[in-house]
Amino acid sequence: MAFMRSHSNASSGMGVAPDIRDTFLELQMKKAFRYVIFKIEEKQKQVVVEKTGATTESYDDFLASLPENDCRYALYDFDFVTGENVQKSKIFFIAWSPSTSRIRAKMLYSTSKDRIKQELDGFHYEIQATDPTEVDLEVLRERAH
């Protein structure tokens, strides 16, 4: 019996587009992107890659990519230097669900979160955010150290 990754049902939320895992591996292993934004395409009944951010883009560029009134999932590759002067990188999974987004969108993203997280196995930290203060750069710094 073949298993289709993009298959979805009411209890598990949306399916996941086949290229999501490859995009994650490009961020994780090849450092091809600074961040990836994912959105739910209701007509396709799956989570898809909406945008990738170049490694030269800033954290402000990433935040500007999150819609003010709609939900998204995101990965952010956070580079930092430890107290011992060692360069490190941690990948954050962010479930962005602003309080101003539609209730239906919040429900769809909530029920689909576990499914996309299965495809993104290997991120270090998860943040659930409802407003910009919850994804401030300081929040990432504190979690990464």
From Swiss-Prot:
It comes from the Eukaryota. SMART domains: ADF. PROSITE patterns: ADF_H. The keyword Lyase does not apply. GO terms for molecular function: actin filament binding. Coiled coil: none annotated. PANTHER family: COFILIN-RELATED. This is Actin-depolymerizing factor 2. Keywords: Actin-binding. Belongs to the actin-binding proteins ADF family. InterPro entries: ADF-H, ADF-H/Gelsolin-like_dom_sf, ADF/Cofilin. Residues 13-145 form the ADF-H domain. One of its GO terms (biological process) is actin filament depolymerization. GO terms for cellular component: actin cytoskeleton; cytoplasm. It comes from Oryza sativa subsp. japonica. It holds the Pfam family Cofilin_ADF. Actin-depolymerizing protein. Severs actin filaments (F-actin) and binds to actin monomers.
